[in-house]
Amino acid sequence: MRVDPHTFAENFIPEDHFKSQARARGVELGTVDTTPGAGAFLRFLASTLKAQSVVEVGTGSGVGSLWLFDGMLPSGTLTSIDDEMEHSQIAKLAFADADIAPSRYRLINNSVLDVISKLTDRAYDLVVVRHNPEDLSYVINEAQRILRSGGALVIDNYYGGGKVCDAAQRDPRTVALRDAGKIIKNDTDHWVSSL
């Protein structure tokens, strides 16, 4: 029996009980959460960067946050921004279930446009963007300002369900994702890009 390589990669590092439970809560609310494969990559990247301070745009159900906590330094702090109060509430529940101390996170309920510009310059090791692609150009510029030298920006679910690869797709969300990719790819003074 042949296994699809994408399915194999997505399930190579299985989610623990806390992530599965958070994901199930998120499905009920319709949250946008990181996939298991992308979550494993976020854990890897946070660990490689020895991330102390991380910003997450789009808390969802907290699945991506839990993956980030797995890779961050034990004293690391996550700032997660989501404009949906229900998302922050179920994420907080997921963090409590996983025994993540409240001192390790800030859940901010507001628009990323109202929050990210107030974050401290050069104070973060990693910025993960999971939703609001229409705001991506602005978030990319702000990420450049708030990231420390050697920090990383991740646009989770960049492919937009395959639409970014399909030139015939012209909806605003897909165009915003494509434009964000071009900004990062073309700004070689500030970014080293990869898909």
Report residues per predicted region:
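A short alpha-helical cap/connector motif
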Residues: 1-126, 133-154, 158-195
